[in-house]
Regions:
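Juxta-kinase regulatory segment immediately upstream of eukaryotic protein kinase catalytic domains
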Residues: 1-32
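ATP-binding pocket architecture of kinase catalytic cores
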Residues: 33-186
């Protein structure tokens, strides 16, 4: 587990300060929560940002993705800034849906790890443990037809990603050494 989550209220206060500085006005985070269903590659925090604007209270649901501080991460090389950059480039240069990004912090001094924020979309989160295609609500609460629609939409979206010109997105510099994908990973 990430040590900073042990002090959830301290994390909440640090995020309030950071977001306030980036937005140029005071914000509050009434409560932080960690979703029951979460991925294995990042620590995920859910919260609402609230603030006053024109005499009215405003609110935005947000997700914070924190780089894990574990000894054996899911990925051999972990670059949270690159994840953010890729989503930003795709969001600005295509009509492929990506999260609305709200900020990136690469300085680990604030929370002990890098993190980024994105607008939260309401919905159910498929679990990684157990894998959602083997057990859990997607297997037991959806019909075969619903799963087919979901999987086809995922494949169609993946195909759209592969049609993007990585050079136009500025990713030609991301060359990994090795001729094959396996060699590049090793």
């Amino acid at each position: 587990p990430t040590p900073l989550i042990a002090d959830i209220d301290g994390t909440r206060r640090k995020l309030e300060t950071w977001i306030s500085a980036h937005r140029g006005h005071a914000v509050r985070i009434p409560e932080l929560s960690i979703p029951e269903a979460t991925g294995m590659s990042n620590v995920t925090l859910l919260f609402d940002i609230t603030w006053q604007e024109d005499g009215r209270q405003r609110s935005e649901p947000v997700v914070a993705r924190l780089q894990p501080s574990i000894e054996r991460p899911v990925f051999p090389g972990y670059d949270l800034g690159l994840q953010y950059e890729v989503m930003e480039a795709i969001g600005c240069n295509s009509d492929i849906p990506v999260p609305q990004l709200r900020g990136l912090e690469t300085d680990k001094s604030l929370l002990g790890v890098q993190f980024y924020l994105m607008k939260r979309t309401e919905g159910r989160i498929p679990t990684d443990m157990p894998p959602y295609n083997m057990d859990g609500w997607m297997m037991h609460e959806t019909s075969v037809q619903q799963r087919q629609v979901l999987w086809q939409a995922a494949v169609d979206t993946m195909a759209r990603y592969h049609q993007l010109d990585y050079r136009k997105l500025g990713f030609a510099r991301l060359h990994a050494p090795g001729r094959t994908p396996l060699q590049q990973q090793l």
